[in-house]
């Protein structure tokens, strides 16, 4: 099931619909039983949610928050080259938000961990869903 073709197929709204549908398919397929009591989960008919008729547990798709960071100094931008990874090109700094951490704290921690710099003048640019890895 190679869904990578959605990255380059168009029009974009159809590609987005295909990626979203595949992500939901994976989620429904991987969440069949209640994590509390083991009973079979039921799909809700009005929202993207599964529920347990036995213990009333509800489950929603989980989205992992991630950040991509452009560290700049004037007209210069800091790129990183990850060691010991399959991806060998230069890239912006990035990482996942940990439990109890704000997105701003994630940015500061990731920059410190990856390149040892303190972040100043933090500015938000925009968000983008990334359904291939269930991240935002």
Feature map (PLM): residue ranges:
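N-terminal strand-loop-strand
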Residues: 46-92, 96, 118, 123-124
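Glycine-centered helix-boundary capping/hinge motifs
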Residues: 1, 38, 116-118
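N-terminal phosphate-binding loop and adjacent alpha-helix
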Residues: 102-103
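Acidic, metal-coordinating catalytic segment for phosphate/diphosphate chemistry
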Residues: 18-67
